[in-house]
């Protein structure tokens, strides 16, 4: 065979092999995230193992009018991912011997009806209080937006519980709004100040903030949107967006990486309390975290859904792996996307 023909055959072989090669790990991830490309509302995703960033993607727009792009320090509303921070604040007060898991609601907020003597702090943490969701109780024309104390005012008018505390599970934002007010009542500090001074500052989470309109600012803020068939509508705030305890913290993948590296607050409380936080009860819910098995690995995780935002975080303690996925659009649900990212990674690493 002529040398030129040999070269051609070798070249053709390389082309064929390359063309048939399976998509790379990063290509498969990028395919999943295609809907978030500019000029759409965007996404910040980071997968971290130990000290190493395995993969990071920041795509799309944080704010459409200014065409501000999403970056690692872009702050998204965490929505219900906030709950583990509220739970941690309560556990820190238990560490300070100012509360116990068995402390009753009426011992702190005596204005509640008699049933409050049967509701414990642990019931509130694990959605077992029997209190109803507060959202349907909020008047439609209420101004200004309801805050945590306003939730307390509504709930104390509830005459009976949905079920006996501790006997059933009903996911509810009400308990976590109450927990924020309990922190304020016991400490005399605003909840946002407690989080800043006791959690964010010691943990070097410089971007994170529990947002209170007119009192603090959100650096590098992402605005929330709803993407329709014909238009994109700003839906950044709802009637419930001023409630802090159930979903009012803003943070970034940069700060959540720092949070991963300091063990999600492990150093701020005793090992006994951290273990209690991560112990599943009814419906496998701990204190602000869901605990289950995923692909054979223990997983702590939570989703967050608020007006204009959908988020997901998952931590695998046995392999020190954390996925954080933050978006500033009302849909789609990012839980399936996050779990597919994890499956792709586990497949690559043979985990």
Placement of each model-derived feature along the sequence:
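Bacterial N-terminal signal peptides that target proteins for export
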Residues: 1-8
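C-terminal motif of bacterial Sec signal peptides marking the signal peptidase cleavage site
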Residues: 18-19
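Extracytoplasmic/secreted proteins, especially bacterial periplasmic and envelope-associated proteins
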Residues: 24, 28-32, 80, 85, ...
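Short, conserved catalytic-motif segment at the N-terminal edge
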Residues: 25-76, 100, 159, 297
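Short active-site loop at a secondary-structure junction
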Residues: 36-44, 66-123, 163-174, 244-247, ...
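Short, surface-exposed loop or secondary-structure junction motifs
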Residues: 63, 116-307
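Short, gly/Ser/Thr-rich active-site loops of penicillin-recognizing serine hydrolases
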Residues: 295, 329-351
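Short, well-ordered beta-strand elements
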Residues: 301-302, 312-329
């Amino acid at each position: 065979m002529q040398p030129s023909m040999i070269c051609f055959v070798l070249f053709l072989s390389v082309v064929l092999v390359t063309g048939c090669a399976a998509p790379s790990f990063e290509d498969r991830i990028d395919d999943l995230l295609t809907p978030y490309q500019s000029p759409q509302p965007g996404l910040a995703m980071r997968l971290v193992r130990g000290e190493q960033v395995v993969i990071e993607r920041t795509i799309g727009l944080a704010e459409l009018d200014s065409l501000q792009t999403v970056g690692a320090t872009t702050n998204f509303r965490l929505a219900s991912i906030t709950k583990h921070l509220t739970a941690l604040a309560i556990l820190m007060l238990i560490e300070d011997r100012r509360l116990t898991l068995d402390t009753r609601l009426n011992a702190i907020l005596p204005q509640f009806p008699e049933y409050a003597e049967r509701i414990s702090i642990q019931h509130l943490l694990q959605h077992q209080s029997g209190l109803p969701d507060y959202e349907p109780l909020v008047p439609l024309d209420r101004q200004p937006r309801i805050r945590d104390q306003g939730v307390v005012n509504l709930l104390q008018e509830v005459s009976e519980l949905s079920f006996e505390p501790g006997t059933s599970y009903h996911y509810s934002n009400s308990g976590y709004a109450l927990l924020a007010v309990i922190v304020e009542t016991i400490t005399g500090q605003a909840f946002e100040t407690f989080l800043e001074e006791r959690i964010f500052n010691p943990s070097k989470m410089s971007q994170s903030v529990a947002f209170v309109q007119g009192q603090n600012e959100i650096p590098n803020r992402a605005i929330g949107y709803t993407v329709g068939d014909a238009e994109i509508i700003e839906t950044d705030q709802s009637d419930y967006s001023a409630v802090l305890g159930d979903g009012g913290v803003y943070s970034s993948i940069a700060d959540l990486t720092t949070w991963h590296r300091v063990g999600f607050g492990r150093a701020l409380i005793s090992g006994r309390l951290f273990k209690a936080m991560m112990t599943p009860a009814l419906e496998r819910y701990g204190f602000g975290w869901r605990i289950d098995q995923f692909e054979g690995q223990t997983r702590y995780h939570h989703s967050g859904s608020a007006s204009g935002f959908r988020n997901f975080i998952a931590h695998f303690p046995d392999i020190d792996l954390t996925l954080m996925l933050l978006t500033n659009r009302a849909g789609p649900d990012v839980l399936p996307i996050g779990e597919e990212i994890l499956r792709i990674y586990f497949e690559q690493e043979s985990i």
